[in-house]
Amino acid sequence: MSRNVNTTFTLEKESASGARLGTIQFGERGKLQTPALFPAICIMTGPPGFGRQGSHYKYIKRAMCRDWRHNHFLTEILHFTDYMATKRSLDCWLKKPFQTWMDEMMRGGNVDTLDQGRMGDFDYERAEKPYENCFFLDSGGFKLLSNSDFSIEKFGYPTEPKSILELQTKMGGDIIASLDYPLAPLAYDTKSLVQLQNKSLENALWLLKAVDKRKGKEPKPLIYLAVHGVDYETAHDYTDRLLQKIDRLGTKYSAFGFAIGSLVPRRTNRGLVASIVKGVTDAIREHRNGFYSQKPVHAFGMSGDLIPTLVMLGVDTFDTNSFVQTGKNLKYILPARATDKSVRETRSIDELSADTLRMCGCRACKSYGSLIEPLKRLVRLERDKRHQVEGSARDLIKSEAYAFLSMHNLEIEFREIERVKAEIAKNTLNRYVLDYAQRSNNRGNLIRAYEAATGQIVPRPDGRRVSLNLTRDSFTIPDSYRPPEGKDILLLLPCSKDKPYKSARSHQAIRGAVPDLRVHVVTISGLYGPVPEELEEQPEVLFYDYVLSPEAKEQTEEVTRRVTDYLRRYGTNYKFIAAYVTGRAYRIVAKRALKAYGKGLLLPSDPKEQTSKEFLRYENVRELQQALLSPIAQKHRQDAQLALSM
């Protein structure tokens, strides 16, 4: 399907609360109603074409295109660096835009078998009619967050805005985003923050000017200009500066909007995320009496329980890859009617039955309802091989189980979007958001987001409950526990006062600074020893209050023993092990446990002092980032450090 790229956004309705309904028009006749959630997927997962390679992604793409006819995806264009090693492979992809590659996947029979990987695949005997898809091509700036040395020069492209636009154009982007530099969740002085923001701001202006120069039938995508801030004030200031510069540019190109970045590293702090988004949308509404207020607004990486609140603030589009990550962890999000808590409650695949899938009734559950028992057996088998599984008439590969769970989880997200649209149409979204926050099981986090969005204070019970009856034997890792597949980097962190640990500012900062999906965080509790991130919300972990001190020698020995036991039991699951600890008591535990196990890297390597204030020092966080960039390349460094400590 050859087509012109000419994408526009039209605001159809805006409620008193600020929530909006709109339409994105793309291609020849394509339409997408907003608010909309773009599934973030990887497309270039090896040699062409669209339905070939990529483990679970190939099944997701095949089902969502050939069966669902889903018409909007986001992909971060630099993801090819994770799957390809040569310029030649990339050049093969760039011969055609993504729309053409997708059209070829829709054909039936044995045409282009090599390109589409159809040999031996059960569902390619039928042809499906091609249709238009809206491809949102993100610049890939998030890769720069954890690796400032990232480069695509070996593929023939300098890492600069001009190259990014060239790639987005060749790939056929209907929506494109400017090359940006996300802000890690660290403490910035004003000068450093503005310098980082200005790099993104200048790239946004460059992109707008570059597309404004296009003429005739040259592609005219909808442009999202990236905006960044670390709180309300800095987000508001950045947005206002960007708008003033756009005014001075005097460009005539009108198909642009604003994409809010740097939210993913802060997403566990829902109130902060809402404040940052409000800073952006307030600045847009205030500038020149709302001159740009009909432009679309995107929130990068936001989905799930935050969507209702952010829609109320005026966000039109979202994207998410969390449905894939939840699926890879073999988790199934329960439909809202199956729980009185929130849409975030999950079950493991082992807990599912045909009745569970039948009650859900989503497209994924309908497709795989008869295969749930074989899939439960399949996840225990070897990866990357086809298996004959009892109960299935055809061979199965483990990636299909991941794909099924991922697509079901995405369907739950889509249902929430549709519910939000209905509430906007009825002018009842504000009440819905408050009810949603109050019934959520997120321990007040969504209440804080609602308060940040509206300025209203919501009464709620005092503080976090602490149990005085918990002992060090109140929590243990179950014998059935296994570290999640695909996470082959172990990162040990010290515990925090705030629970769950992932909600603590210190943990948020480190998780944001090392967003590699392969990192498995295990927290060293001063009371319990190792606590894997999947078990952080166990009641015994949420409600204890104990800080390990160097003087508690017997407890220090017990915690050390438990951490050592964890390493000996599960250490072979990881290709790289590191402990990032600055406090003296927890550093003693980490050092002794790593030494007893025989490998692992203790960071920071030489802190100025052994106190918690060193935890977020820029130099120390940067050392951690560098250590995790290439775990295998760090092997000699690990061995050297251990040898020195013996």
In which residue ranges do the predicted regions lie?
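Non-catalytic, usually N-terminal nucleic-acid engagement modules in DNA/RNA processing proteins
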Residues: S2-G216, N445-P483, S496, Y501-P515, ...
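Glycine-rich phosphate/ribose-binding loops and adjacent secondary-structure elements
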Residues: S2-R3, G30, R214-P374
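A short, charged/proline- and glycine-enriched loop
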Residues: T34, P219-P221, P484-L490
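A cross-family glycoside hydrolase active-site/sugar-binding cleft signature
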Residues: L37-A40, F73-H79, F136-G140, S178-L179, ...
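A structural motif corresponding to the C-terminal end of an alpha-helix
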Residues: F122-N133, S163, L167-I176, N203-I223, ...
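Gly/Ser/Thr/Ala-enriched C-terminal appendages of enzymes
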Residues: N321-N442, V563
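A polyanion-binding, active-site-adjacent surface
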Residues: K487-L490, P494-Y574, A578-V581
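Glycine/proline-rich loop-helix segments at beta-alpha junctions forming the active-site rim
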Residues: T556-M646
